[in-house]
């Protein structure tokens, strides 16, 4: 039985490095694609809570994954709530209800109060 021809190894799944093209004559240099994350915001909150504490890149990756997961859960639940009520817009009310449904007890209360505070601050600054 003939062996199949081996091709170049495929890049690992979840690889974060941007693929750069070799520069051709007359072409402009290609920029690396930006990878969005919540790391700067996680770092700012960490410094507010514990100014003398650092965070490893692995821990930051976990925190980024956590924030993305919670965001998707809240957005999904808010979307479902809007659909149930035959609405085409997700308002702060849907977000608040989604948070109450997803987060347990005291955590939900704190999240709702912080969210209300943030919305009030935003509307007053407009």
UniProtKB/Swiss-Prot annotation:
Residues carrying covalently attached carbohydrate according to the record: 113
Biased composition (Basic residues): 13-34
Gene3D superfamilies tied to this protein: Histone, subunit A
Domain of life: Eukaryota
GO molecular function, one term: structural constituent of chromatin
Ubl conjugation is among the record's keywords: yes
Tagged with keyword Signal: no
Assembly and binders: The nucleosome is a histone octamer containing two molecules each of H2A, H2B, H3 and H4 assembled in one H3-H4 heterotetramer and two H2A-H2B heterodimers. The octamer wraps approximately 147 bp of DNA.
Gene: H2B-V
Function: Core component of nucleosome. Nucleosomes wrap and compact DNA into chromatin, limiting DNA accessibility to the cellular machineries which require DNA as a template. Histones thereby play a central role in transcription regulation, DNA repair, DNA replication and chromosomal stability. DNA accessibility is regulated via a complex set of post-translational modifications of histones, also called histone code, and nucleosome remodeling.
Protein name: Histone H2B 5
Stretches assigned to coiled coil: none
Compartment(s) of residence: Nucleus; Chromosome
């Amino acid at each position: 039985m003939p062996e199949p021809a081996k091709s170049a190894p495929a890049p690992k799944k979840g690889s974060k490095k941007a693929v750069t093209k070799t520069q051709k004559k007359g072409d402009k240099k290609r920029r690396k694609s930006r990878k969005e994350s919540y790391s700067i915001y996680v770092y700012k909150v960490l410094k507010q809570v514990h100014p003398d504490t650092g965070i490893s890149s692995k821990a930051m990756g976990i925190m980024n994954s956590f924030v993305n997961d919670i965001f998707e859960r809240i957005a999904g639940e808010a979307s479902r709530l809007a659909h149930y009520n035959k609405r085409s817009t997700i308002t702060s009310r849907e977000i608040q209800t989604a948070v109450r449904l997803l987060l347990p007890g005291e955590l939900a209360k704190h999240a709702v109060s912080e969210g209300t505070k943030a919305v009030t601050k935003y509307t007053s600054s407009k």
